[in-house]
């Protein structure tokens, strides 16, 4: 059975984490510049990420969340039935990532100070603003050898490596707390309680032709399925898998 996957954050902080994760993934995929338009995705993702860095103190929030995870896993030390070797390995990884995060510069500082990026950032988001007469510096850069452009991209991405490593680890461990269970949305609607949850993950069979509209917070949520073709609320029963991740 073919399914499509959905994730939904249950608090604003996790919503931002997922957005930054998506931007980092887009930058990574586009950094090969294998065709003539990948630079659009790369720079747009980079500048969107800088906007987020300027709006919130992402470093301090992520550091607090990693410390909370670390304390949770430390409480499992010497607990019978827990693989202590695996647990100690995980704690070592968490400690290393957290240490690198704390010693890193403020996210985006080097990128904001980069002369080339500063020169193109303001006009890049104008409608059609990447034309050569709007952004001559970008036009010149695009004609540099591919290996030079890829090297520049890697250097820019390396400035946020501590963020990337910490965010990937926090989201990985958070997702692993949830296990998919079969659920039924009666007449296309499902609601439930969730104790201090961060993320909902859904696997929905494509055959239903629906997508979810989700509302809620860390303690309670509701899912309404929408028919893709009509745009109306679905009234049939929908069997799907749900994981609640804390």
UniProtKB/Swiss-Prot annotation:
> An example of a Gene Ontology BP annotation on this entry?
FtsZ-dependent cytokinesis
- Which first-to-last residue range defines the signal peptide? none
Tagged with keyword Cytoplasm: yes
| Predominant place of localization | cytoplasm
Q: Which domain of life is it from?
A: Bacteria
- Compartmental location: Cytoplasm
Keywords carried by this UniProt record: Cell cycle, Cell division, Cytoplasm, Septation
Question: What Pfam families is this protein classified in?
Answer: ZapD
Task: Return the InterPro entries for the record.
Answer: ZapD (IPR009777), ZapD_C (IPR027462), ZapD_sf (IPR036268)
The Gene Ontology CC terms held by the record are:
cell division site; cytoplasm
Keyword Cell cycle attributed: yes
Instruction: State the family it belongs to.
Output: Belongs to the ZapD family.
Q: How does it assemble?
A: Interacts with FtsZ.
Write out the function statement from the record: Cell division factor that enhances FtsZ-ring assembly. Directly interacts with FtsZ and promotes bundling of FtsZ protofilaments, with a reduction in FtsZ GTPase activity.
State the protein's name: Cell division protein ZapD
Gene of this entry: zapD
């Amino acid at each position: 059975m073919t399914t499509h996957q959905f994730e939904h954050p249950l608090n604003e902080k996790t919503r931002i984490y997922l957005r930054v994760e998506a931007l980092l993934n887009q930058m990574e995929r586009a950094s090969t510049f294998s065709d003539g338009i990948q630079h659009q995705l790369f720079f747009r993702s980079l500048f969107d990420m800088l906007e987020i860095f300027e709006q919130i103190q992402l470093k301090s929030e992520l550091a607090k969340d990693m410390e909370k995870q670390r304390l949770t896993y430390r409480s499992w030390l010497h607990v019978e039935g827990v693989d202590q070797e695996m647990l100690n390995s995980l704690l070592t990884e968490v400690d290393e990532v957290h240490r690198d995060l704390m010693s890193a510069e403020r996210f985006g500082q080097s990128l904001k100070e980069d002369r080339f990026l500063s020169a193109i950032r303001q006009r890049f988001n104008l409608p059609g603003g990447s034309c050569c007469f709007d952004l001559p510096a970008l036009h010149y850069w695009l004609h540099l050898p591919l290996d030079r452009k890829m090297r520049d991209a890697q250097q820019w991405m390396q400035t946020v490596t501590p963020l990337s490593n910490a965010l990937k680890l926090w989201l990985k461990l958070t997702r692993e707390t949830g296990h998919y269970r079969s659920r039924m949305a009666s007449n296309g609607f499902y609601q439930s309680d969730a104790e201090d949850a961060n993320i909902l993950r859904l696997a929905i069979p494509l055959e239903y032709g629906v997508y979810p509209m989700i509302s809620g917070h860390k303690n309670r949520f509701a899912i309404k399925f929408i028919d893709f073709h009509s745009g109306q609320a679905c009234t049939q029963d929908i069997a799907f898998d749900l994981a609640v991740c804390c």
